[in-house]
């Protein structure tokens, strides 16, 4: 069954088939989720030397899968580390219901969450764009022209991002988030004090390691790091997927926020 025919399936199929693969930190060769690709096993990520742009920087462009938390952000913590969440926010998290997940209601995932659909990186000299197939076909723009964060930001789903290169790693600094999105299916929270620093390193032609430092003194006792791996999807293109056209099943989701 190809992707175009799967897009019309109910959200239940999408969620149920996806998380087992997408929530893993480093899926070896992920099976495409319903609504986002053929159910046949995806080809192995290509190997070989990393390509470069004419300006000498690493070429990060292409269609990728994964690279961030889906089911549980703790999957990205280092072995033995625990989430430094404040007790009052743990109570809020424990009370959350799956039906209230903004992502399940066709709203953006925010940062650093990924939905279980492909996404694309586009690079220019002045901007890097992240284009997302899932939900509302949203995008992030990362300013690469040396500007600073404005002092009067209105809170938004993806915040305000500025990028720079440290050797072969793209470093993305983001502030100005709203507090409306969840970090994952289980409702891990944040506040408008959230500040993220993402480090994108293309270790091979088909592998992109994304390390994110999360600093949110409103909800956590200290900054912490998560690491996830995205795999290149050679030959893939992003499809038009309008979540609002196919979201009738969300009204049947019940119970506490959890991994499906």
Q: What annotation goes with each model-predicted range?
A:
Residues 2-260:
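PEST-like low-complexity, intrinsically disordered acidic/proline/serine-rich tracts
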């Amino acid at each position: 069954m190809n992707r175009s025919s799967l897009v019309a399936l109910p959200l239940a199929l999408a969620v149920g088939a996806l998380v087992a693969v997408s929530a893993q930190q480093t899926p070896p060769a992920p099976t495409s989720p319903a609504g986002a690709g053929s159910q046949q096993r995806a080809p192995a990520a290509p190997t070989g030397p990393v390509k470069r742009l004419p300006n000498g920087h690493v070429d990060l462009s292409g269609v990728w899968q994964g690279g961030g938390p889906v089911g549980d952000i703790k999957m990205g913590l280092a072995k033995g580390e625990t989430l430094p969440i404040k007790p009052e926010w743990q109570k809020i998290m424990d009370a959350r219901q799956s039906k209230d997940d903004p992502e399940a209601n066709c709203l953006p995932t925010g940062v650093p969450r990924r939905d279980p659909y492909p996404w694309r990186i586009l690079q220019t000299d002045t901007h890097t764009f992240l284009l997302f197939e899932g939900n509302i076909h949203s995008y992030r723009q990362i300013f690469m022209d040396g500007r600073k964060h404005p002092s009067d930001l209105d809170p938004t789903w993806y915040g305000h991002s500025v990028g720079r290169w440290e050797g072969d790693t793209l470093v993305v600094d983001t502030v100005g988030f709203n507090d409306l999105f969840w970090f994952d299916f289980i409702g891990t929270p944040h506040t408008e004090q959230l500040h993220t620093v993402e480090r994108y390193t293309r270790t091979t032609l088909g592998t992109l390691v994304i390390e994110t430092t999360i600093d949110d003194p409103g909800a956590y006792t200290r900054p912490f790091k998560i690491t996830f791996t995205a795999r290149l999807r050679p030959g893939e293109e992003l499809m038009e997927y309008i979540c609002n056209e196919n979201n009738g099943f969300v009204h049947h989701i019940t119970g506490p926020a959890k991994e499906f």
